[in-house]
């Protein structure tokens, strides 16, 4: 196997090493370990509007205490909101179960983090980057791609790929003891039955007990909304209106938001009151192994429902079909860490220019528990939905007459005749047979 010189398998002593620092046990221990082993760690923390983070400003201070040469907090929220809206406009969601989608909130967060943190590192002349992703997951590849796209001279050093680090600090207990031994009164948080990763767009709960499919959504404590499955949690029906202008969500309940970050936060609050957007998915990781996750995305779900309602009321069938096909493909590219690749940009351009630009209007919904909702009203100056065209009542100046329909049906005789001929061929060859007691063609028993 050829050696990848971009990935450093041992600590680059004496060199600047940027680390994506969360302030948790793993990155705290890694930063201190790198410092004591002779590297020059620089800490970078992304403010992604994580709903489970109370004090972002405290994180860089903590990094300095653990030995960082410098620590910076990078505000990524505006860019994350921008990419979230782009995903809504393109329907870039390929994982779904029973019609309920996973809104690719973690891949969107990685696209923003991977580019903005590495860009900040370039400003500090830091060309080696490490983060906490493991070799079995998706993030190691996503960060690898986005990092090198942003800085082609980038080298990758991950403590979790360094055998010396693994031997010395291979587990949470060892990392905690290491911090205590070096004078830091670190108290391990109580471990949950699963791990959580979040940003402003959504939360991901996975691993540990959730790896077992007989552990359901009920073991999860939502961080962006309510446990709607709990009968003791009071959830009242609520009407909400969402307004779009040229594909961009701009108002909730009649209130306009100039700041997309505030818009998402309010959408999260509204949807979260009902548990909207929670889903349980089995998905294929980039390496084709299957994983399972419980997801939250109340704001994304609210915007997606309203946007697609307008899409179906404004665009024709072929456009909608292409939007859905392209969205599935784009969602997979996003999941794989290819959000800025040329094929993804091509699909994004198609949807944002030719689909989203026409999406102006307002949708009113009633939200109940979980993903239970009703659409109460749809308004748009661009609607091609015109009920008089198909009215069962007698109307003046009808769009077409009975004679027109007779002519249209007569033209169908051409393909009906062709289809009947093909069915005869299939029947003669044994591919189709008439089932017992049935006049409908059925697949034959021949192998």
From Swiss-Prot:
Main location: cytoplasm
Cross-referenced InterPro entries: Arg_succ_synth_type2_subfam, Arginosuc_syn_C, Arginosuc_syn_N, Arginosuc_synth, Arginosuc_synth_CS, Arginosuc_synth_type_1_subfam, AS_cat/multimer_dom_body, AS_multimer_C_tail
Family statement drawn from the similarity comment of this UniProt entry: Belongs to the argininosuccinate synthase family. Type 2 subfamily.
Binding residues for ATP: 20-28, 46, 132, 134, 139, 197
Any Pfam family the entry gives: Arginosuc_synth
Top-level EC class: ligase
Keywords: Amino-acid biosynthesis, Arginine biosynthesis, ATP-binding, Cytoplasm, Ligase, Nucleotide-binding
Alphabetized Gene3D superfamilies for the sequence: 1.10.287.400, Argininosuccinate synthetase, chain A, domain 2 (3.90.1260.10), HUPs (3.40.50.620)
Gene: argG
SUPFAM superfamilies in UniProt: Adenine nucleotide alpha hydrolases-like, Argininosuccinate synthetase, C-terminal domain
Gene Ontology terms, MF aspect: argininosuccinate synthase activity; ATP binding; protein homodimerization activity
Record-given protein name: Argininosuccinate synthase
Residues bound to L-citrulline: 102, 138, 142, 195, 204, 206, 283
Entry keyword Ligase: yes
Organism: Neisseria meningitidis serogroup C (strain 053442)
Catalytic activity: L-citrulline + L-aspartate + ATP = 2-(N(omega)-L-arginino)succinate + AMP + diphosphate + H(+)
Annotated residues for binding of L-aspartate: 134, 138-139
PROSITE patterns: ARGININOSUCCIN_SYN_1, ARGININOSUCCIN_SYN_2
Gene Ontology CC: cytoplasm
Description of how the protein assembles with itself and partners: Homotetramer.
Domain of life: Bacteria
EC number(s) from the headed UniProt entry: 6.3.4.5
Compartments, as annotated in UniProt: Cytoplasm
GO biological process, one term: urea cycle
């Amino acid at each position: 196997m050829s050696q990848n010189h971009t990935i450093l398998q041992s600590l680059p002593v004496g060199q600047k090493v940027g680390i994506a620092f969360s302030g948790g046990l793993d990155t705290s221990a890694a930063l201190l370990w790198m410092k004591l082993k002779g590297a020059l760690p620089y800490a970078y923390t992304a403010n992604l509007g994580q709903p489970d983070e109370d004090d972002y400003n405290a994180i860089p201070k903590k990094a300095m205490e653990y030995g960082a040469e410098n620590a910076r907090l990078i505000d990524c929220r505006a860019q994350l909101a921008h990419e979230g809206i782009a995903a809504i406009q393109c329907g870039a969601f390929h994982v779904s179960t029973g019609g309920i989608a996973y809104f690719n909130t973690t891949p969107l967060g990685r696209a923003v983090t991977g580019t903005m943190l590495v860009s900040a590192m370039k400003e500090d002349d830091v060309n080696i980057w490490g983060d906490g992703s493991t070799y079995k997951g998706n993030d190691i590849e996503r960060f690898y791609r986005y990092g090198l796209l942003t800085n082609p001279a980038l080298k990758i050093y991950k403590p979790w790929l360094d055998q010396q680090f693994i031997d010395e600090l291979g587990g949470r207990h060892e990392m905690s003891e290491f911090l205590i031994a070096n004078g830091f009164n670190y108290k391990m948080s109580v471990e949950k039955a699963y791990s959580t990763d979040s940003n402003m767009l959504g939360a991901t709960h996975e691993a540990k007990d959730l790896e077992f499919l007989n552990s359901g959504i009920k073991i999860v404590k939502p961080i962006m909304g309510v446990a709607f499955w709990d009968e003791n949690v009071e959830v009242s029906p609520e009407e909400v209106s969402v307004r779009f202008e040229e594909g961009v969500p701009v108002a909730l309940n009649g209130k306009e938001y100039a700041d997309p970050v505030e818009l998402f936060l309010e959408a999260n609050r509204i949807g979260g009151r009902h548990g909207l957007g929670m889903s349980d998915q089995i998905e294929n990781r980039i390496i084709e192994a299957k994983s399972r996750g419980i997801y939250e995305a109340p704001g994304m779900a609210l915007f997606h429902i309203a946007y697609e309602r307008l899409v179906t009321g404004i665009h024709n069938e072929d456009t909608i079909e292409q939007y859905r096909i392209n969205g599935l493909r784009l969602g997979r590219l996003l999941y794989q860490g290819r959000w800025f690749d040329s094929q993804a940009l091509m699909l994004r351009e198609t949807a944002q220019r030719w689909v989203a630009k026409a999406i102006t209007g307002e949708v009113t919904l009633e939200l109940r528990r979980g993903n239970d909702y009703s659409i109460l009203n749809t308004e748009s100056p661009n609607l091609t939905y015109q009920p008089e065209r198909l009215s069962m009542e007698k109307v003046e100046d009808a769009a077409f007459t009975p004679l027109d329909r007779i002519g249209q049906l007569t033209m169908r005789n051409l393909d009906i005749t062709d289809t009947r001929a093909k069915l005869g061929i299939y029947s003669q060859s044994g591919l189709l047979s008439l089932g017992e007691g049935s006049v409908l063609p059925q697949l034959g028993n021949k192998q």
